[in-house]
């Protein structure tokens, strides 16, 4: 979508005050009246000039460092004495502007960043052609598509399609939980997920297959080592390791094992996920409520290109439940395009559309 920059010649913005910065009173403690950031294009006036903070995201603060560079920082990363922007107004009157109409070009009746404002329906048609074009554009420009995946990807036949997207250069990084990797690895070693075959039939003693898969990987030392020694021979994790695509596996309170690569410290996991969210030029969130919302909170609604131009960050959220897609948007990820369908259908149909476009270009998929 086209980016419409703010009109800084407007009287309020042309003659308004600089943003005010107040030192943080202690590590991880913010000054009273701190400005709570959004994921929309945001500007702070410093030295009479409107500037955008680096590494934007919602639910954080704007910090002016010793070199007068603006950064977006999480509360827990703020140190005593850091200069933190204060102010509640988002229209520039306090030196901070949230540009809510950046991609509409039209004045909004109520331009403030808000939660709980979604419109999602399973009756909306899915434009797979557009989604395929977005993926191809990202690959062509050397972008960094971040995929956030839930366990349904492994339970369904979507597993093979995910492997195809990895092998053909459409995945920059994958963020997921322990279960995604466990089910995928179980499928590689035993041909089942949670003891079920690809046809959904239970196998004798299959209830323990995922534990045996975890044990084999722990014996190898890591997922990469299990790929190298032949324990894992196919699947999503095998494709990621083979293609040297980074992944972050985040633990939860209910995890079995977990696998040795899983990050069990929530704050360390946040930092690991954030490192990829900062680089994301597109996000595809499939069949996972918690990981989708967590990642959505880390993503800006826009991408700043190397030449300084700005475009909307395409964010696709796929789930069989309208509730999940609505909740993501209600938590502030307004730019998310909701697709209410199951993971298997979405992945397979999207792959067919991408393959068709590649064939029309005369550059068929390599695998």
Predicted regions and their residues:
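Glycine-rich phosphate/diphosphate-binding loops that line cofactor/substrate pockets in enzymes
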Residues: 129-145, 240, 275-280
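C-terminal functional extensions of proteins
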Residues: 197-198, 203-247, 252-283, 288-367
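Gly-rich Lys/Arg/Thr-decorated short loops/hinges at beta-loop-alpha junctions or inter-strand turns
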Residues: 104-119, 141, 214-220
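Loop/turn positions that initiate beta-strands
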Residues: 79-87
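Gly/Ser/Thr-rich loops at beta-strand to alpha-helix junctions
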Residues: 90-91, 149-156, 179-182, 255, ...
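Short acidic, glycine/serine/threonine-rich loops at helix termini
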Residues: 96-100, 157-161, 184-190, 259-262, ...
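Active-site histidine-anchored catalytic micro-motif
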Residues: 166, 171-216, 285
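Long terminal accessory regions outside catalytic cores
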Residues: 1-70, 74-79
């Amino acid at each position: 979508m086209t980016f419409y920059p703010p009109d800084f010649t407007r009287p309020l913005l042309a003659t308004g005050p600089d943003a005010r910065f107040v030192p943080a009173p202690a590590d991880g403690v913010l000054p009273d009246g701190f400005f709570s950031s959004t994921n929309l294009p945001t500007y702070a006036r410093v030295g009479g000039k409107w500037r955008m903070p680096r590494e934007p995201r919602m639910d954080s603060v704007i910090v002016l460092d010793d070199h007068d560079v603006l950064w977006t920082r999480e509360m827990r990363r703020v140190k005593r004495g850091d200069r933190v922007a204060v102010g509640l107004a988002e229209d520039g009157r306090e030196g901070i502007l949230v540009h809510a109409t950046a991609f509409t070009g039209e004045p909004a009746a109520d331009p403030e960043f808000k939660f709980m404002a979604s419109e999602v329906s399973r009756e909306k048609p899915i434009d797979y052609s557009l989604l395929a074009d977005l993926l191809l554009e990202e690959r062509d420009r050397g972008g960094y598509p971040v995929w956030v995946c839930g366990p349904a990807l492994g339970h369904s036949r979507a597993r093979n399609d995910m492997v195809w997207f990895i092998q053909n250069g459409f995945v920059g990084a994958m963020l997921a939980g322990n279960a995604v990797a466990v089910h995928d690895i179980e499928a590689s070693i035993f041909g089942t997920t949670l003891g079920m075959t690809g046809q959904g039939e239970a196998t004798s003693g299959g209830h323990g297959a995922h534990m045996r898969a975890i044990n084999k990987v722990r014996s190898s030392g890591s997922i990469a080592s299990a790929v190298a020694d032949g324990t894992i021979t196919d699947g999503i994790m095998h494709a990621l390791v083979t293609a040297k695509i980074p992944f972050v596996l985040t633990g939860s309170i209910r995890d079995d094992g977990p696998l040795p690569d899983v990050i069990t410290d929530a704050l360390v996991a946040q930092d690991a996920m954030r490192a990829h969210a900062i680089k994301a030029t597109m996000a595809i969130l499939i069949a996972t409520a918690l990981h989708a919302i967590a990642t959505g909170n880390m993503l800006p609604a826009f991408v700043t290109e190397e030449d300084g131009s700005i475009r909307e960050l395409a964010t696709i959220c796929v789930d069989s439940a309208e509730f999940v897609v609505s909740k993501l948007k209600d938590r502030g990820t307004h730019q998310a395009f909701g697709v209410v369908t199951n993971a298997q259908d979405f992945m397979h149909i999207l792959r067919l559309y991408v393959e068709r476009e590649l064939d029309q270009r005369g550059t068929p998929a390599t695998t």
